[in-house]
Amino acid sequence: EERIIKDFELSKFIYCSDAGLASKKNKKFNNIQNRAYIITQSLKKLKKDDQEIALKHTGFLEVGSQSTKRINIDDTDFTDEINKNRLFYKEIPLESPVEERLIVTYSPKYAAYQKNIRNKQILRASNMIQTNGKLKKNQKNPNDPARFIEKITTDKDGEVIEEYYSLDQEKIKDESMYDGFYAVTTNLEDEDIKAIIKISERRWQIEECFRIMKTDFKARPVYLQNRDRIEAHFLTCFISLIIYRLLANKLNNK
């Protein structure tokens, strides 16, 4: 950011980042001299009281609607096609050294997407259990299917039994609580909610592209040494991503 200010002589901009760069130092730096920020907030890392309010299904407004009536998202039938693209939000005051607001959104389309991804991972976890091999959890990968597997060594009475593996239903239930929910913190006071969400949404779309490139198209690691071949590899991945996005758009992201 300091280089942007120096090299491009820009002093007024909105800093947008994921939760990994949500330090107090970054927020303070972007709270002066016409700078502002929109930063992803991990719902899992909120204080317990704030988390309960954020994940509560009541108190929502609809983005783009003039209605001030608060909505309980459980009262909406999201199997109805007309409701799938609706987006809801609520604001929660936070105790913070910087004057900011927490904006929590709920998207039924995003909830369905997350549930679909998790169901595939649960299926992979079930297959891992059935192989009867030794299971190694990749602690560095939060999307490792093995996170849904628990080792059972005692029965319900606490008696030691021959160990076996089973799906961790508590873990599955815990993760499903966050389906569809997303949150950002911002020091923008007068900016429209819809505009703030739009800015943050573009960052999420870029991140998803990188994820698809890496996981689906195996962009990395690169097992090549010749520069021309390396460039050809990334060009192939990039063209594949464009085709993927065009097909997804054609199929309405189904």
Would you name each region that the model predicts?
Residues 1-254:
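Anion-binding and metal-coordination hotspots
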